[in-house]
């Protein structure tokens, strides 16, 4: 296998709906050259190509792999990492330059969306921390046993639909604004889902509006979660009254959602969802095909080398 120990392998993921998406790469490229970074890069052409490109980088011996993208691109990268033998994976580190419609995992580490210099300097310093991943284990419609890892969160129910609406907004500016009107639809849709969930010794068997299982901040629904304690935070949201729902928006955007009376927080290593009728599921901000039958969500401790500020 060829060796590229010190050279960065960069996967550039253009932001969906952005005006002149290549402008961001031009800025990244200038910063890399100004700091004399040795790198190779490839550009992702489709939403599903990141995994293939990261695998190519790993097979070509790169030890520092950088994703210029958002949560979904990072999700594809870590799922590729987890298909790599542990002894090989332990020698590779993952960095990010935020460039997605949603960059929640980068925000957890106080990385700014448009501060390219900060991100490049962070990767150049190469301060690495082993982080946890969440993992959903399920059966697909063909009866096959499947799994998918996540960095940030899994959302089940209405919030999964809201996140998807936000992703569909055209342009970065509209995307940031779209979460508010999409969320306001909750008031009028009044959607609930019949769920049966086991969290340690607790059993929740009732109608639920949304469940968020967070390895990190979970778009505000698991604000106390951290990806290095071997635990998942779970927020189960029952259906509030309209006045309480408006209050909930304020608490969500101020990072205090756990103070809301309709939000029931848990911390665990495993959650079993025995039933979630009609509920959509999103993994790191992207909808997945709904599992057939029960599914399990677990945490896998210290499995990825992530470059942090």
What are these regions (language model features)?
Residues 155, 159, 212-223:
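Glycine-rich phosphate/pyrophosphate-binding beta-alpha loops
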Residues 170-177, 224-246:
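Gly/Ser/Thr-rich active-site loops/lids in small-molecule metabolic enzymes
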Residues 199, 236-309:
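ATP/nucleoside-binding phosphotransfer catalytic cores, i.e., glycine-rich phosphate-binding loops
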Residues 1-68, 79, 121:
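ATP/NTP phosphate-donor binding region
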Residues 2, 35, 83-209:
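Catalytic core of DAGKc-family lipid kinases
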Residues 191-193, 207-209, 228-232, 267-269:
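A generic structural signal for short beta-strands and their flanking turns/coil linkers
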Residues 50, 73-77, 131:
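Short glycine/serine/threonine-rich phosphate/pyrophosphate-binding segments
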């Amino acid at each position: 296998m060829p060796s590229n120990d010190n050279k960065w392998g960069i996967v550039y993921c253009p932001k969906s709906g952005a005006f002149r998406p290549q402008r961001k790469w031009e800025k990244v490229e200038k910063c890399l050259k100004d700091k004399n970074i040795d790198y190779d890069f490839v550009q992702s052409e489709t939403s599903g190509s990141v995994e293939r490109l990261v695998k190519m980088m790993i097979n070509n011996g790169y030890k520092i792999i950088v994703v210029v993208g958002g949560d979904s691109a990072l999700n594809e990268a870590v799922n590729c990492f987890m298909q790599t033998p542990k002894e090989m994976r332990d020698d590779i580190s993952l960095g990010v330059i935020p460039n997605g419609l949603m960059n929640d995992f980068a925000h957890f580490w106080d990385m700014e969306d448009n501060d390219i210099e900060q991100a490049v300097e962070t990767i150049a310093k190469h301060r690495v921390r082993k982080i946890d991943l969440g993992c959903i284990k399920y059966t697909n419609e063909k009866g096959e046993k499947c799994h998918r890892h996540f960095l940030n969160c899994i959302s089940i129910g209405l919030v999964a639909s809201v996140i998807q609406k936000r992703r569909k907004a055209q342009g970065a500016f509209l995307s940031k604004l779209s979460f508010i009107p999409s969320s306001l639809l909750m008031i009028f849709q009044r959607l609930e889902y019949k769920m049966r969930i086991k969290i340690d010794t607790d059993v929740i068997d009732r109608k639920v509006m949304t469940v968020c299982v967070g390895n990190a901040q979970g778009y505000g629904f698991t604000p106390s979660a951290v990806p290095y304690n071997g635990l998942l935070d779970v927020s189960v949201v029952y259906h509030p009254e309209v006045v309480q729902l408006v209050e909930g928006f304020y608490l969500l955007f101020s990072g205090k959602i756990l103070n809301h009376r309709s939000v029931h927080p848990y911390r665990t290593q495993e959650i079993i969802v025995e039933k979630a009728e009609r509920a959509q599921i999103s993994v790191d901000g992207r909808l997945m095909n709904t599992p057939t039958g029960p599914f399990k969500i677990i945490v896998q401790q210290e499995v990825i080398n992530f470059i942090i500020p």
